[in-house]
Amino acid sequence: MAASASTAAGEEDWVLPSEVEVLESIYLDELQVMKGNGRSPWEIFITLHPATAEVQDSQFVCFTLVLRIPVQYPHEVPQISIRNPRGLSDEQIHKISQALGHVAKEGLGTAMLYELIEKGKEILTDNNIPHGQCVICLYGFQEKEAFTKTPCYHYFHCHCLARYIQHMEQELTTQEQEQERQHVVTKQKAVGVQCPVCREPLVYDLASLKAAPEPQQPMELYQPSAESLRQQEELKLLYQRQQEKGGIIDLEAERNRYFISLQQPPAALEPESAVDVSREPQPPNALSAEQSTSLADQSTLPTSLPMTTQYTYEKTSGAGPNQQRPGETQKSVLDPPRHGRGSWRQYDRRHPKGGECCTPKGTSEIHELPPPEKPLKETVDLKAEPRNKGLTGHPQEKGPGSWQGPSARRTRDCARWERSKNRTPGSCYPHLPRGQGAYRSGTRREPLGLESEEGS
């Protein structure tokens, strides 16, 4: 009971609650108070602006003053901190903190909160010029220059901001026209001109901004120092050394390295093709004589033989009328073009029934093709095997092909052979009656018990 009574008596004697009530009546809603209990300190928040007779457009700097008041106040100095500074440099913020600390130490033991708040306003009023540079032109602000402040406390020269707004309005108009051309429907409403620093929507009067004078900034001529000149010389020598060793890549030369120009200059006329203007016209008789002479010269030139493509085909072992031994490959040259045959007789390519060889039209005898003037290709001449059905003896051995004379066997012509409709691949071979044993021809082995087509 005694402890609680002493605590209540101490709260009644504490000057902080009464001082806070006075501050709330002066600053109204600008002051925010967070009351603590007996162990935690109180906190007071207030946003300070320069004293400009409530003209907000002339207030270019501000900050939020935070005071943490301990339980032993006023016999203990409150903790001072600055938050959310606008238009102030770090150096200025540090100076403001030091100035407020000196005021608090001087008023130790008395009510000092009002003095701290008013000292902060006084410092802001004296430094009502924003520190820093215009983010558009990157020049600092001077006292006699026309500059403006946005609601988000960012600062620009009036002339620079007017140019920025005009540019952004043109960009927005171009985007709207492009969307209308492409028939794009935007669900979100188009946002106006935004702050170039924080992208907050701007509230501006373009006419008044354009009427402001252009900021005059002194043009500073660059004069390199001796150290910078020495570094330039060293870099120049290094560049030359790298260029000599091929370490510098020329982008233009590399780009045109594999460039092929399709534009060629017109070729000059040769003396032979140029028209001789001084030459007199000749009569028609002379022209005809010259033409006949040129034709005679051309007729005396040696005529080259026509080049014919030699087509060859290979025969592999298998069933057929011209079957060969396994592992043996024969090649034959197809008949040459008709214009190279000379005065040869035309042969009928139609094949009679029974598989007889082709014969010339109007004749019943088998003739041998005369040899051409020059063989197109030295290959083995394929001979047609006899197709007589009653042949029972051993077939004659094929001799080497030759163009020197007639062969022991008849030769087929160069015409294409066709198989009759009622013949099978094995019907062109001679057949033995059933039960007469195997038929052997030379070293070739045929299947046993071959039957003829007619008998069964």
UniProtKB/Swiss-Prot annotation:
InterPro entries in UniProt: RNF25, RWD_dom, UBQ-conjugating_enzyme/RWD, Znf_RING, Znf_RING/FYVE/PHD
Subunit-level organization: Interacts with UBE2D2, and may also interact with UBE2E1 and UBE2E3. Interacts with RELA/p65.
Residues reported in the UniProt entry to bind Zn(2+) 1: C134, C137, H157, C160
Polar residues biased stretches: 288-332
Compositionally skewed regions (Basic and acidic residues) per UniProt: 364-388, 410-421
SMART domains the record matches: RING, RWD
Protein name as catalogued: E3 ubiquitin-protein ligase RNF25
Family that this chain belongs to: Belongs to the RNF25 family.
EC main group: transferase
Biological pathway: Protein modification; protein ubiquitination
GO molecular function: NF-kappaB binding; ubiquitin protein ligase activity; ubiquitin-protein transferase activity; zinc ion binding
Any one biological process term the GO annotation gives: ubiquitin-dependent protein catabolic process
EC number(s) on file: 2.3.2.27
Taxonomic path: Eukaryota, Metazoa, Chordata, Craniata, Vertebrata
Keywords on record: Cytoplasm, Metal-binding, Transferase, Ubl conjugation, Ubl conjugation pathway, Zinc, Zinc-finger
Modified how: Ubiquitinated; autoubiquitinated.
Catalyzed chemical reaction(s): S-ubiquitinyl-[E2 ubiquitin-conjugating enzyme]-L-cysteine + [acceptor protein]-L-lysine = [E2 ubiquitin-conjugating enzyme]-L-cysteine + N(6)-ubiquitinyl-[acceptor protein]-L-lysine
Tissue specificity as recorded in UniProt: Ubiquitous.
Zn finger intervals (RING-type): 134-199
Binding site residues for Zn(2+) 2: C152, H154, C195, C198
Free-text function comment from the UniProt entry: E3 ubiquitin-protein ligase that plays a key role in the RNF14-RNF25 translation quality control pathway, a pathway that takes place when a ribosome has stalled during translation, and which promotes ubiquitination and degradation of translation factors on stalled ribosomes. Catalyzes ubiquitination of RPS27A in response to ribosome collisions, promoting activation of RNF14. RNF25 catalyzes ubiquitination of other ribosomal proteins on stalled ribosomes, such as RPL0, RPL1, RPL12, RPS13 and RPS17. Also involved in ubiquitination and degradation of stalled ETF1/eRF1.
Domain RWD per the UniProt entry, residue ranges: 18-127
Location of this chain's protein in the cell: Cytoplasm
